[in-house]
């Protein structure tokens, strides 16, 4: 069927900020879809609130709106643009929920707008638990016994009938939010109560638990002519009971017989046809390992995290084709872009194994609840490709960047057998390493299977890895053992460890015997047809399929898996850098390990290597491709950390040189550089042990800010008040980077701002200064940032620009640089300098219109700012006000304290832009879900050092009609100052303590601060977590509360009696 001519203008809804459960895969899907629709000649309108995405670049759609994804704003845009149709299936759960809301509000009918891709009835049937159950019964598809409940009592009655364990799944929530497995009535009551609150329709599904079954996923496509196919089938290493986003996954399925595969395939195709989905769809099934019995778990009627993985695992561009199907094209008339000859109707065939391992944030959140269940906790994931399962698993392990180069954590060798068995049974994020340790200790795989319900096939592969380790131990320097280990994915580093040698010795031994990896192409058809894609993975076999071209090439290192502190912003910079390299006439090569992102889309670069970002893997690509040089400044800390070793191996690092990177990172060198340049910084010292640190703190005076050098996202950074806390910090935190000393700085409590600059070594372009709303002490990634600055005098802005120029030239920066400043008493201090692209690059590029990463790349390749038509110094300011606001995922992470501080905690960001600060703030708060009602009750519980400041806020809240409530100490202080506040009870005082009031909906907002000492107060944490659970706006920094107040006041009319 040819494409539709009756529609011209299509609106695509994006997925908003990155949160746990909805990450960069939707940027990849949305970007592909917009480009595919433009390619077919449609006018595309995009709405998304997340500036850190490629999808919100001007060239991706005809019109791009970076506005809050709320009914109020989307409705306005629709009325302004009048699209003929809306495509909601590429915006994750956010997109689907928005489509449902627009329909319920009558907007779609009113303006005669059609929904493309998936009909509303299908979204309803897949998402509404009752309708889904009815449909499965009609299709004779088995589902676990279940019931829909609207109260906790109904849940208890049902569970008594069918017996425990049961699973609770709230309707219309994302990433299993609010759900869980309950093995007792007590757990059931707690989880159901929370689940009902989180479900927008106040309903939960209670179902019999099938934990322990194999979890299998099918990624399917269907078009309007009812052609349907399976793109990829995937098998979870972990059995049912752990969210698929938190499971290790292999593609294709590894343990199914042909009969089982066909049975589940038929079920998946039957379901997509019954739902009449036009586009992509993901079906999750549970298979009994001991019979042919299976259950359908759930269906996602949209592009999902699994479809991004399936696209990268097979090379089949699901989102692109889904967008074209939505406008009427069919699978049998679209060419598969990978082969360029076969049609999209061909099911991909794989002659390799793909492994995906999730990346968790527990290196940042040491107190977080690490046990895995039906609620997702991973922030990102890595993928690796190999010719056997062992190879792909080990490559994925070393892609994770958690300090391991193998499926082994050395720290586990000291734990007791008892602890080991507990950790093997109760799955945590690192269970793979505990399982491997158990096998090394001689536990039989049969025993482990009965404890974990993980298939023997997988455990046998882990045993095989251990057998190869033992073989290496017995045959040191043996070439055949080396060859075998390399074939199964062992790294040089691991082999060196076993043979007690240096990694370079193993590399030399490989080279002397011509033992190099070859690169195989990902071609969707198991090499049956010729493919034209430049998409490769390494393996130790004979035939190499990647040929060096005769064009000069440049290698760009990506940023690996998404984690807190290193998000999609770095991928954004990577993609832009590649565009500039191609424009300059070079061949652009990307190396990365993250399946969710735009950078690993094979159509972005001239060549893509899907490989771990380790020294060995990068060097292997360099040996083959012989690029002119490598760019490391766009890949976050991941790429910067490789610069030293690559440079020592003789590789040309383009842009800022390694010794200059070192001058910015190494404390003593940095201090020396600042002194030479005459730039003030907070007084500070380095320390390598406890005595030195105490001595430094004594000299500088408390409070001090302590942190390890060479880290990203404020990892292990703390503000310390006294000697005892400093000792405690050194004993627990310094392990963050063993060979580098820690830094002890005077802590200046002032206004913070940051600058991104681009330098060619002689002149420096400063696109803009971003002023932080929160004062120093809150990590820059967690602060709200305003551009252009609203409260900095012209003189201070000039000083900042001057210092930035001096730094860029003094540190020989070529390309990007980020500088953070703190201002106190009109004095500007430099806190830190990062000679690389930072997380503010996409935001600043969008609001200034300067394609910063592209310009930086051109400078790295030898052009000057003057060549490109840019002046030296601060770029003219934008007339609008733009705000970047952080977005957190605390609802997904139990036991993680939501208090803001110097260690970064946000997972994503949104942007609000308008003609005034108040309007821009309003949009930013709406976009990050901090909607505050116009009146209600607000609770203050404030540390002594900020009570005076809180008082003036409380007075302003009262003036606009809020009722003030406060805890004992705060209420007493307010009363002394003439402001009466309702007293709330102490924690544990069942009737009116804060958590109880919050639970009953009596509180609209909470302002809760702790002293500089930031002691982990149990009560405060309970108050904060109750606010997070119930979705009540919580302010842990007075500056944020002040910003919100500004918005409320601007929307308030003055009402006075005459």
Swiss-Prot record:
Binding positions for ATP 2 per the UniProt entry: 707, 746, 748, 752, 777-780, 820, 832
Binding-site residues, Mg(2+) 3: 820, 832
Residues given in the record as Mn(2+) 2 binding sites: 298, 300
InterPro entries registered for this protein in UniProt: ATP-grasp, ATP_grasp_subdomain_1, CarbamoylP_synth_lsu, CarbamoylP_synth_lsu_oligo, CarbamoylP_synth_lsu_oligo_sf, CbamoylP_synth_lsu-like_ATP-bd, CbamoylP_synth_lsu_CPSase_dom, MGS-like_dom
Repeat recorded as keyword: yes
Pathway this chain belongs to: Amino-acid biosynthesis; L-arginine biosynthesis; carbamoyl phosphate from bicarbonate: step 1/1; Pyrimidine metabolism; UMP biosynthesis via de novo pathway; (S)-dihydroorotate from bicarbonate: step 1/3
Catalytic reaction(s) noted: hydrogencarbonate + L-glutamine + 2 ATP + H2O = carbamoyl phosphate + L-glutamate + 2 ADP + phosphate + 2 H(+)
EC number: 6.3.4.16, 6.3.5.5
Residues bound to ATP 1: 129, 169, 175-176, 208, 210, 215, 241-243, 284, 298
Residues where Mn(2+) 3 binds: 820, 832
Cofactor details (free text): Binds 4 Mg(2+) or Mn(2+) ions per subunit.
UniProt-listed SMART domains: CPSase_L_D3 (SM01096), GARS_A (SM01209), MGS (SM00851)
Residues noted as binding Mn(2+) 4 in the record, renumbered to the chain: 832, 834
Region (Oligomerization domain): 402-546
GO BP term, pick one: 'de novo' UMP biosynthetic process
Domain MGS-like: 930-1058
GO molecular function: ATP binding; carbamoyl-phosphate synthase (ammonia) activity; carbamoyl-phosphate synthase (glutamine-hydrolyzing) activity; metal ion binding
Transmembrane segments: none
Domain ATP-grasp: 133-327, 671-861
Segments of this protein annotated with the region Allosteric domain: 930-1058
Requisite cofactors: Mg(2+); Mn(2+)
Domain comment, as recorded: The large subunit is composed of 2 ATP-grasp domains that are involved in binding the 2 ATP molecules needed for carbamoyl phosphate synthesis. The N-terminal ATP-grasp domain (referred to as the carboxyphosphate synthetic component) catalyzes the ATP-dependent phosphorylation of hydrogencarbonate to carboxyphosphate and the subsequent nucleophilic attack by ammonia to form a carbamate intermediate.
Reported function: Large subunit of the glutamine-dependent carbamoyl phosphate synthetase (CPSase). CPSase catalyzes the formation of carbamoyl phosphate from the ammonia moiety of glutamine, carbonate, and phosphate donated by ATP, constituting the first step of 2 biosynthetic pathways, one leading to arginine and/or urea and the other to pyrimidine nucleotides.
Protein name: Carbamoyl phosphate synthase large chain
Organism classification: Bacteria, Bacillati, Bacillota, Bacilli, Lactobacillales
Record gene name: carB
